[in-house]
Amino acid sequence: QGGLPRPGPEIPP
């Protein structure tokens, strides 16, 4: 998962 701003390392979709 990814693409959404999260408090941590963002994983690209």
From Swiss-Prot:
Q: Name one GO biological process term.
A: regulation of blood pressure
Q: Can you say where in the cell this protein is located?
A: Secreted
**Membrane spanning stretches:** none
Q: Which UniProt keywords apply?
A: Hypotensive agent, Metalloenzyme inhibitor, Metalloprotease inhibitor, Protease inhibitor, Pyrrolidone carboxylic acid, Secreted, Toxin
Q: Which GO molecular function entries does the Swiss-Prot or TrEMBL record give? A: peptidase inhibitor activity; toxin activity
Give a brief account of the tissues where this protein occurs.
Answer: Expressed by the venom gland.
Q: Which residues carry this modification: Pyrrolidone carboxylic acid?
A: Q1
Classify the main location. Answer: secreted
Entry's Gene Ontology cellular component terms: extracellular region
Q: Does Secreted count among this protein's keywords?
A: yes
Asked if the keyword GTP-binding belongs to this entry, the reply reads no
Can you tell me which family this protein belongs to? Belongs to the bradykinin-potentiating peptide family.
The record's function comment reads: This peptide both inhibits the activity of the angiotensin-converting enzyme (ACE) and enhances the action of bradykinin by inhibiting the peptidases that inactivate it. It acts as an indirect hypotensive agent.
Q: What name does UniProt use for this protein?
A: Bradykinin-potentiating peptide 13b
Organism field: Bothrops jararaca (Jararaca)
